[in-house]
């Protein structure tokens, strides 16, 4: 026999060791496993969805959201609600690719890149600290703006003290509702008209309302 036929036979024998047919049965499970791993991996996106509301004229855990002392206060039969946004995918609240994909398909959610919300590499501790700082600044600015308004309308606010209590809510966007709630407490004007009114917006110490994100 010639050399070429022997090489062909040897090649066929080697080929049997590497029969690709068994891989056909493994390809499906391998692809499925890879897909699952991708879906459960942390996402590089932030998911924003509607969050809970809080009545600034009411209480949270037994404490008045807006506690005013040193002046006469009044009750409002209605509610002034501050609205919030639930954010997943921020430091300390990871979101998977699967969750981001489902949110992308939902008309009630917004999906945006993480770098548009917080600096890359920011820790959960620093994120929470910054968010709480924004909330504290928002409350202080709202109190200052409300006092300026009340004083301009003839109310004596020299002895007025204000403290605000709210749990698990950060950011600056509740300032407008805090200011309205404080003014309503002191004037007794029933700003709600006995109804339930929801609102949002930042507010600086001079009473200027600013834009907010996420809603």
Predicted regions and their residues:
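Intrinsically disordered, Ser/Thr/Pro/Gly-rich linkers and terminal tails that flank
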Residues: 1-173, 180-190
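Glycine- and Gly-Pro-enriched alpha-helical subdomains that act as flexible
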Residues: 171-192, 197, 201-215
């Amino acid at each position: 026999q010639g050399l070429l036929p022997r090489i062909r036979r040897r090649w066929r024998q080697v080929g049997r060791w590497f029969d690709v047919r068994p891989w056909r049965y493994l390809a499906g499970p391998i692809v499925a496993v890879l897909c699952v791993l991708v879906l459960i991996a942390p996402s590089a996106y932030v998911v924003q969805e509607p969050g809970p509301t809080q009545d600034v004229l009411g209480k949270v855990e037994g404490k008045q959201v807006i506690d005013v002392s040193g002046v006469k206060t009044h009750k409002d039969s209605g509610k002034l609600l501050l609205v919030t946004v639930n954010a997943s995918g921020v430091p300390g609240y990871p979101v998977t690719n699967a969750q981001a994909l489902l949110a992308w398909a939902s008309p009630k959610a917004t999906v945006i890149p993480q770098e548009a919300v917080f600096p890359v590499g920011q820790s959960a501790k620093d994120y929470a600290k910054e968010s709480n700082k924004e909330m504290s600044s928002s409350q202080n600015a709202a109190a200052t703006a409300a006092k300026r308004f009340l004083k301009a309308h003839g109310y004596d606010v020299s002895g007025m003290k204000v403290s605000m209590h709210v749990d698990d809510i950060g950011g600056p966007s509740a300032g407008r509702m805090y200011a309205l709630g404080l003014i309503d407490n002191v004037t007794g004007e029933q700003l709600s008209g006995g109804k339930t009114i929801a609102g949002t917006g930042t507010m600086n110490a001079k009473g200027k309302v600013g834009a907010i994100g996420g809603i």
